[in-house]
């Protein structure tokens, strides 16, 4: 094994550890030092692997994030609790620095699929650790009834489930592309964990993500073939989903889905969690209408929930959280990230249609899930967005390479045409 190959594999291991440690050890004080150490290790090993020198990048990834973090800090001037806002700004800055260090290494990768496989393996590590932590029997029991849901003992169970669901989406993409099919065996612990956590968001992510991977696989087919395969895929997906929900381990999540629908329709037993979240959206929007420009200060939403609900927590909705705490400017500065990414995915879609489609669907799922969670300060979410920026740079390079190749073909064609004209005139 060459030095480059050894370092390449070692970086993969460190990166898997980094993405897994976000969830496994986020609650520990030393966690932030582990994040930084792993990030630096990836970059330093990368310099050694490529015989490279230290070069910093100042691109749109840096600009957009710095503008948002700077505005978060600015809201401390009028925040109800300036210290809470400053603490949040510090957390965002630390997370960005770790993500930026990793970005500097992976942005030079020719193929972004390496990063996706790292995420997939990180999800498998989290699932296996969860099985060892809770015990297989306990997790199997936890999925059988909504009252037995796994607790947030070492990490938030929704975050664990979402990480596992993303692994399923990436594994499905690998399967359809006929790569690493043997790793499908790790879907067993992943599905057990999703069932035990009873995360409705993770179940929806799993369903939409796997089906989307099927659509991406057929992206280069003709319209008729694509349409036919999508219809067939829909039928198969419905049958698989129905089959999964009949399993005892998914009984709890099925009950929670039913009570959630009841809370919207007003029929049957309603889900208290969904009703509370609806109330949070309502009071958050009310607070935004009273402070539309600058809000009440980032990370100050607990003042709102304490005032109206008697509990100190966040609003469980990223859109309302940003609007009520940071006003319209916080909303614009943060979601400028998504606007930039979607715009460039569309602009460079022809560089690699499958890659662009996969990331567009993933980004769309992330955006939709913001309706049920506060994600702007999540370490995992910020690293996911960093990967999307890496993907954009990768698509740009592919687009430039195609343009250069097309220019060469055009120049070659002109020369041939010129020579043929000479031969005729002679």
Residue ranges of predicted features:
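Aromatic-anchored transmembrane helix interface
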Residues: 61-70, 82-105, 114, 118, ...
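Hydrophobic transmembrane alpha-helices and their immediate junctions
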Residues: 117, 180-181, 215, 219, ...
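A membrane-periplasm/extracellular boundary helix in multi-pass inner-membrane enzymes
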Residues: 196, 214-266, 285-290, 424
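Alpha-helical transmembrane segments of multi-pass inner-membrane proteins
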Residues: 113-141, 152-219, 364
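N-terminal signal-anchor transmembrane segment
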Residues: 1-49, 68-78, 366-368, 383, ...
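Long extracytoplasmic/lumenal interhelical loops at the membrane interface
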Residues: 140-146, 150-151, 266-326
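Membrane-interface helix-loop-helix junctions at transmembrane boundaries of multi-pass membrane enzymes
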Residues: 2-10, 47-63, 174-185, 218-229, ...
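Transmembrane alpha-helices of multi-pass inner-membrane enzymes
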Residues: 40-43, 169, 356-370, 375-426
């Amino acid at each position: 094994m060459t030095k480059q190959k050894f370092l390449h594999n070692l970086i993969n291991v460190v990166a898997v550890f980094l993405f897994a440690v976000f969830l496994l050890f986020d609650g520990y004080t030393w966690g932030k030092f582990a994040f930084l150490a792993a990030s630096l290790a990836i970059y330093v090993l990368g310099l050694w692997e490529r015989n490279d020198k230290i070069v910093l990048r100042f691109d749109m990834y840096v600009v957009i994030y710095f503008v948002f973090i700077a505005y978060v800090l600015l809201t401390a001037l009028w925040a109800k609790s300036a210290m809470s806002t400053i603490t949040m700004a510090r957390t965002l800055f630390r997370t960005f620095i770790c993500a930026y260090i990793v970005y500097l290494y992976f942005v030079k990768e020719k193929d972004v699929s390496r990063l996706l496989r790292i995420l997939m393996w990180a999800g498998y590590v989290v699932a296996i650790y969860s099985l060892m932590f809770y015990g297989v029997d306990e997790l199997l029991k936890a999925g059988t009834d909504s009252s037995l849901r796994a607790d947030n003992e070492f990490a938030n169970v929704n975050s664990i489930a979402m990480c596992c669901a993303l692994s399923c989406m990436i594994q499905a993409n690998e399967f359809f592309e006929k790569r690493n099919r043997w790793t499908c065996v790790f879907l067993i612990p992943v599905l057990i964990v999703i069932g035990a956590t009873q995360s409705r968001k993770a179940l929806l992510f799993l369903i939409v993500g796997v089906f989307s991977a099927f659509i991406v696989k057929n992206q280069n087919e003709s319209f008729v073939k694509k349409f036919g395969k999508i219809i067939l895929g829909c039928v198969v997906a419905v049958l698989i989903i129905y089959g999964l929900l009949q399993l005892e381990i998914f009984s709890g999540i099925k009950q929670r889905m039913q009570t959630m629908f009841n809370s919207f329709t007003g029929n049957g037993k309603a889900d208290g969690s969904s009703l509370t979240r609806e109330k949070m959206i309502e009071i958050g929007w009310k607070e935004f209408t009273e402070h539309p420009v600058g809000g009440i200060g980032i990370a100050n939403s607990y003042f709102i929930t304490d005032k109206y609900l008697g509990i100190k927590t966040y609003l469980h909705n990223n859109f309302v959280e940003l609007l009520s705490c940071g006003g319209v400017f916080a909303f614009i500065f943060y979601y400028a990230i998504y606007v930039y990414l979607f715009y460039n995915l569309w602009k460079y879609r022809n560089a690699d249609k499958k890659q662009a489609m996969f990331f567009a669907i993933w980004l769309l799922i992330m955006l939709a899930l913001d309706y049920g969670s506060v994600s702007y300060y999540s370490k995992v979410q910020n690293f996911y967005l960093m990967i999307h920026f890496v993907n954009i740079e990768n698509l740009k390079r592919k687009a430039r390479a195609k343009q250069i190749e097309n220019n060469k073909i055009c120049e070659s064609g002109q020369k041939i045409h010129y020579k043929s004209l000479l031969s005729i005139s002679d």
